Swiss-Prot record:
Organism: Methylococcus capsulatus (strain ATCC 33009 / NCIMB 11132 / Bath)
Lineage of source species: Bacteria, Pseudomonadati, Pseudomonadota, Gammaproteobacteria, Methylococcales
Gene: aspS
Catalytic activity: tRNA(Asx) + L-aspartate + ATP = L-aspartyl-tRNA(Asx) + AMP + diphosphate
Protein name, entry field: Aspartate--tRNA(Asp/Asn) ligase
Gene3D superfamilies reported in the protein's UniProt record: Bira Bifunctional Protein, Domain 2, GAD-like domain, Nucleic acid-binding proteins
Superkingdom of origin organism: Bacteria
Subunit text: Homodimer.
Entries under SUPFAM superfamilies matching the protein: Class II aaRS and biotin synthetases, GAD domain-like, Nucleic acid-binding proteins
NCBIfam families xrefs: aspS_bact, PRK00476.1
GO cellular component: cytoplasm
Subcellular location: Cytoplasm
Amino acid sequence: MRSHRCGEVNESLLGQEVGLCGWVHRRRDHGGVIFVDLRDREGLVQVVFDPDHPEPFSLAETVRSEYVIRVVGQVRARPEGTENPNLKSGRVEVLATSLEILNRSETPPFPIESDIEVNEEMRLRYRYIDLRRPVMQQRMRLRRDITRFLRNFLDHHGFYEIETPFLTKATPEGARDYLVPSRTHPHSFFALPQSPQLYKQLLMISGMDRYYQVVRCFRDEDLRADRQPEFTQLDIETSFMNEDQIMTLMEAMIRDLFRETLNEELPDPFPRMTYAEAMRRYASDKPDLRIPLELVDIADLMAGVEFKVFAGPAADPEGRVVALKLPGGGDLSRKDIDDLTRFVGIYGAKGLAYVKVNDLGAGLEGLQSPILKFMPESTIRGILERTEAQTGDLIFFGADKARIVNESMGALRVKLGQDRGLVEKGWRPLWVTDFPMFEWDEKSGRWVALHHPFTAPKCSEEQLRQNPGRALSRAYDMVLNGTEIGGGSVRIHRTEMQQTVFDLLGIGEEEAQQKFGFLLNALRYGCPPHGGLAFGLDRLVMLMSGASSIREVMAFPKTQSAWCPLIDAPAQVNDAQLHELGIRLRKNPAVEGGTVPST
């Protein structure tokens, strides 16, 4: 039907006849000559209809926006002064000699333009229209380029692409599973995989040596801007490599990816930082290194002061007291500070103390703060020295349980960096290493795995049992501009160590056999040392395309309430289907107020 795509028409085709198919992007009638901007995936080309060709000219008078047409015509140079430097085809046009309307279109619900603001629910309801917009076409093209490059890189390095099952078994991995009832096995359920974690470990035991997969994963969890109930991972596993070797290979892949697709150079090697250092300096295990603000611990300076807001957390083994200097922040008004106080309150902070440094040379007289009267001069001077404060700066304080301080002050650091224009340009990758093996869950009163229960510890089995709270894991996360784009670890490859970890997590031998017996059995048959990681493909494309959400780089995403406006899913099923599956609903949701909530 066509000889070329619209975006491929250029000066190399001057004088040639071409056949084009696409959508009418814009139609203009200028003094008896009709101009149509014809659009397809590759771009736009201007098509001219003049009265010298009466049949196509007459038909062109009837075409409207988003009609699908086929044009045959001759490529010619645009008249001097009418060139469009913004188009690849901007120096030429096609003089139409034939026109066929392949399909008509109703008026679209919104313009097919990249810079038009449209309600997100409307965009998702008419996603097939939204995906026609040039910006969405560019994102899908970049996603294709990224996926193709990653596959080629891994193929070149001896990895096999192997598919793993979608219908699997429910296992505790930190989020709720999507369950699928089995018709052939009554009262039993499959689960959709949260990741191929166990299957890829079994592939290493199978001797596959190096595996990867571009795979859909499913998690039934509360959604945030960077989460979806179904998402895509680049899943990787390899045998006989330690963490340094895995990290070196993976950062080479990401470095080559940025060079190939964005013409951007990333550092070689990527910097590395321990989890403890990241939390100490940035109150985050995925710090954005483009923001030049750091937290400073001052608990030792607060020991013994009468100001209980600081003294209490300073004396608490689980507490933390920090200072965060904002250079030039002395110009913030009281209203600005009140707004920031409400912001940190979202994360559990009970307030936001501060000191303005109006004139460092004037001593205490040059400082402004309601908390100065509660602290001795030596403490104040110690804070000024440790934060290296200068005239015009503003120092914020966080004091509470370490978790609350980290969450609130870490978020404040990012907000101040963004609001004050402090975020540096460029790409700042980072490896975060030496994560704790476990964290204590107050609600359940037990240890939980910080990553997953198959991560290998750095210590011996005996040391792990003696002090699980101090054990570090062989885990590593790749962070880019404050977003975790990949995470992995060296895995446990001995049955005894795996059972020890299960014991510490409160998973007894009987429960472990019931849920993970297949893995424990496989570990007994010559399991090699192995490790790997998974990259969030959606997040990676989001960052590289400059999109604000992973929904912007997925063809058919769900809303933040896990609903698809396009096909109205999830939806009810009829009684016959439920009966066949042996399921009976206790209540009828239709009677109780409808089916799916809107966003």
